[in-house]
Amino acid sequence: MKEQTFKNCFMLKSKIKTHKSGKMYNQPHFFILNKGLNSGKPFRHYVCNSFVFLADDKNERDFYYFMLQGIWELRLLRPYLKGTAIEFVRLGDVIDVLEEVLNSVNSGNRSFYDVQKALAQIELHQTNLQQQLSNLMQLRKALFYEYLRRK
């Protein structure tokens, strides 16, 4: 795969927007939760109270999705949470943290594409395990139902 540097930080401001309810997107995109303790967590599906990242292609979408997944898992946005009852993160803070991480990644010889496939495989396995767990819970309920409803 051709190596690209996604360092154009000024372009991030035009790619991350506040999602408006009911709006549909034709280009590759993902959502970033902006309220609660999970602020900054990326989602491939729509979530309420979110920003949307509008990518030019799937490679760019996947790159930024996994970058934000790493930022969320390392809790790099926690110091930027505002609010007392319901905490939230501002769009500008998300962009600033993402720019800082991109500058640090792009300054070294590390290639994100080296780990992107492994991260995608881990996500696939995690989804598979969640489905297996859901099936086991349904089986458990069915067994209880069969046992308790038997006359």
Whereabouts are the PLM-identified features?
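Amphipathic alpha-helical segments
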Residues: Y64, I95-Y145
